[in-house]
């Protein structure tokens, strides 16, 4: 009777779920789209009177600037080419702006024929991103270069690591500006701005530098601010002033997309002695590095300009007085590239070798805490060592997937004594499970006595019932830290494993919906429910393997005392299979392999104590069939 009731309840839940999903896709979805279309049409009609030349109506129905293609935006200025082992692109002579960069060493997808990653793009193009440098006038001073100023350069110049470029501008009022731009073989530009005062009066001006984004992508694979696990937005390390915060440099990370605009659109007057400031994506960084002996004021700001949110990280240096006939120079560095940990560390310590575990023997910082550009998370004390050990294993085997498996073995060995005690306790609990059940039946009307006799039984058998939780509690920060490593470190991006796994930082690309590729069909193309099939129901081979190993691990454990808890535990493998199917496959490989090692360890202990377990049951069944066949 109870089984029939359970079946009826399950059928009701399945039918109710199917009706809700069908109603959402067939009724609510089309109605919502119709309402959105009507709202856009209404906004567009209201905005027609406000549309100016050079403007258009955006997707939300409001007037927005007419966007140029990337090539059209580049064509708005004469340019000097950039060509290094790591970068390609150009510098605009209009504004002397670094605004066109591609990262040669990284592709947009895991496909070998994929184009390189685009970092900077010129103003006028959608989602423009660039770096500006210059001078701000003091007390109403005029005649300084602006973003519209066209600088002059000798023809044929190409910026390479061995050949800096020189730009000049004469304002016709006695000031001659010279900008010398150099670049190394990786990702660091050096911009030296010199002003020569040929006039008859002294002037005062202050150096500044800015990284600016005109709108950010929010949709698609390059969308920003979509997850809480990764910090993306304005970032910097500022401070170093005696008497302020103990003279420490503080990580500035309160300008995250999209909260930056809503919570703190303006964070200015951030006093610092040197430091650095910029903008970060998950993998890419544009950071301004002032002279470390200079006092600066940092600023994070977002403001709407012509219908577009303009995000800016900038600093202004201390004013400099320039007497007649005098010359002043200010130097700023710009990091524009991938956040590879060895590269950031090299810049942080001025190229001096650093052994990661010798924290007591570190060289002096040249760029304070530059490696903080990588979002290590709240368990940094675990996350960073995990990454460092992974790199060591990777250098040994040449595959990050295998390195993850070796890391899992290493962690198991480190935790072996504690885990061994835990699994021994669990094996004993499973062995005395029939006696525990008898005590429950015997004292079912007296819970206090039942608990007392169970504790006495545990004491007699030398069992600690809480020991079974210890391995899981220990693995929680390790799991989170490995998730962080796989998510935020570019070393994991597009790192292949074997077979169909070409990117350990992405979810398993296979799915049971097309029989793991045997049927040449993309579930995402299914009408109405494509997003559902390619989202929550996208379950690959590795998540299924994980679900099986979790089921076997659960079966090896002693049963829960409460029948309801037993049913909940039975559903755990299914729930976690769905959950982990959306996680980075490298994390699923770690958890699956960890389960295999746990099962092996549990089996050895249970076999030692002669405790019945699913593996022995399976072996006995197979042996029984063999005997019958003979």
UniProtKB/Swiss-Prot annotation:
What parts of the sequence cross the membrane?
10-30, 396-416, 470-490, 528-548, 571-591
Subcellular location(s): the record lists: Cell inner membrane
* UniProt record, GO biological process: protein insertion into membrane; protein transport
Q: Does the keyword rRNA-binding apply?
A: no
What keywords tag this UniProt record? Cell inner membrane, Cell membrane, Chaperone, Membrane, Protein transport, Transmembrane, Transmembrane helix, Transport
Any GO MF annotation of the entry: membrane insertase activity
- Gene Ontology cellular-component annotations: plasma membrane
Q: Which domain of life is it from?
A: Bacteria
What is the membrane topology noted in the UniProt record heading this document?
A: Multi-pass membrane protein
Per its UniProt record, what Gene3D superfamilies does this chain match?
2.70.98.90
Q: rRNA-binding: present as a keyword of the record? A: no
Q: List the disulfide bonds.
A: none
Q: Which InterPro entries match?
A: Membr_insert_YidC, Membr_insert_YidC_N, YidC/ALB3/OXA1/COX18, YidC/Oxa/ALB_C, YidC_ALB_C, YidC_periplasmic_sf
Question: What NCBIfam families does the entry give?
Answer: PRK01318.1-4 (NF002353), yidC_nterm (TIGR03593), yidC_oxa1_cterm (TIGR03592)
Its quaternary organisation is:
Interacts with the Sec translocase complex via SecD. Specifically interacts with transmembrane segments of nascent integral membrane proteins during membrane integration.
The family classification in the record reads:
Belongs to the OXA1/ALB3/YidC family. Type 1 subfamily.
Query: What's this chain's function?
Result: Required for the insertion and/or proper folding and/or complex formation of integral membrane proteins into the membrane. Involved in integration of membrane proteins that insert both dependently and independently of the Sec translocase complex, as well as at least some lipoproteins. Aids folding of multispanning membrane proteins.
Q: What is this protein called?
A: Membrane protein insertase YidC
Species name: Caulobacter sp. (strain K31)
């Amino acid at each position: 009777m109870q089984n029939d009731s359970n079946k009826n309840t399950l059928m009701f839940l399945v039918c109710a779920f199917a009706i809700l999903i069908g109603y959402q896709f067939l009724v609510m979805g089309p109605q919502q789209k119709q309402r959105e279309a009507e709202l856009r049409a209404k906004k567009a009609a209201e905005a027609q009177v406000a549309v100016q030349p050079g403007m258009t109506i955006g997707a939300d129905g409001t007037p927005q600037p007419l966007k140029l293609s990337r090539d059209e935006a580049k064509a708005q200025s004469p340019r000097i080419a950039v060509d290094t082992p790591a970068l390609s692109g150009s510098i605009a002579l209009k504004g002397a702006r670094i605004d066109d960069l591609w990262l040669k060493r990284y592709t947009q997808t895991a496909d070998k024929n994929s184009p390189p990653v685009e970092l900077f793009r010129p103003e006028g193009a959608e989602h423009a991103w660039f770096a500006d440098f210059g001078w701000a006038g003091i007390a109403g001073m005029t005649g300084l270069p602006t973003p519209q100023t066209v600088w002059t350069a000798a023809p044929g110049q190409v910026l390479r690591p061995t050949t800096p470029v020189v730009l000049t501008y004469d304002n016709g009022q006695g000031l001659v500006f010279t900008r010398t731009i150099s670049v190394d073989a990786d990702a660091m530009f050096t911009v030296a701005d010199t002003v020569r005062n040929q006039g008859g009066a002294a002037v005062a001006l202050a150096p500044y530098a800015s990284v600016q984004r005109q709108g950010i992508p929010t949709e698609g694979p390059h969308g920003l601010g979509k997850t809480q696990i990764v910090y993306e937005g304005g970032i910097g390390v500022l401070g170093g002033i005696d008497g302020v915060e103990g003279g420490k440099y503080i990580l500035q990370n309160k300008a995250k997309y999209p909260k930056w605009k809503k919570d703190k659109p303006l964070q200015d007057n951030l006093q610092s002695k040197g430091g650095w400031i910029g903008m970060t994506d998950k993998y890419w960084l544009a950071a301004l590095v002032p002279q470390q002996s200079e006092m600066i004021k940092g600023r994070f700001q977002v403001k709407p300009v012509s219908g577009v949110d303009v995000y800016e990280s900038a600093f202004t240096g201390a004013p400099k007085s320039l007497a007649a006939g005098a010359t002043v120079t200010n130097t700023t560095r710009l990091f524009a590239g991938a956040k590879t940990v060895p590269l950031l560390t090299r810049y942080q310590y001025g190229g001096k070798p650093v052994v990661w575990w010798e924290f007591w023997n570190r060289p002096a910082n040249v760029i304070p805490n530059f490696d903080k550009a990588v979002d290590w998370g709240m368990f940094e004390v675990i996350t960073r060592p995990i990454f460092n050990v992974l790199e060591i294993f990777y250098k040994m085997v040449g595959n990050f997937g295998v390195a993850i498996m070796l890391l899992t073995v290493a962690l198991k060995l480190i935790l072996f004594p504690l885990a061994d005690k835990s699994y021994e306790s669990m094996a004993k609990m499973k062995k005395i499970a029939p006696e525990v059940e008898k005590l429950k039946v015997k004292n079912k009307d007296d819970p206090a006595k039942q608990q007392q006799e169970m504790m006495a039984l545990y004491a007699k058998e030398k069992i600690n019932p809480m020991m079974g939780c210890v391995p899981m509690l220990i693995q929680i920060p390790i799991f989170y830290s490995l998730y962080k490593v796989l998510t935020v470190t570019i070393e994991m991006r597009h790192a292949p494993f074997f077979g169909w796994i070409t990117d350990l930082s992405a979810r398993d690309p296979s799915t049971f919906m097309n029989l793991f590729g045997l049927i040449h069909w993309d579930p995402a193309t299914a009408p109405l429910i494509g997003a559902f099939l390619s989202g929550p129901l996208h379950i690959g081979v590795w998540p299924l393997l994980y679900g099986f190993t979790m089921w076997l691990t659960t079966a090896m454990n002693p049963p829960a005392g409460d029948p309801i808890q037993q049913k909940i535990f039975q559903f755990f493998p299914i729930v976690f299979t769905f959950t982990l199917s959306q996680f980075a496959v490298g994390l699923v490989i770690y958890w699956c392999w960890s389960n295999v090692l746990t099962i092996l360890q549990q089996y050895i202990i249970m076999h030692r104590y002669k405790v019945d377990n699913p593996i022995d049951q399976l072996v006995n069944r197979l042996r029984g069939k063999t005997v019958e066949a003979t």
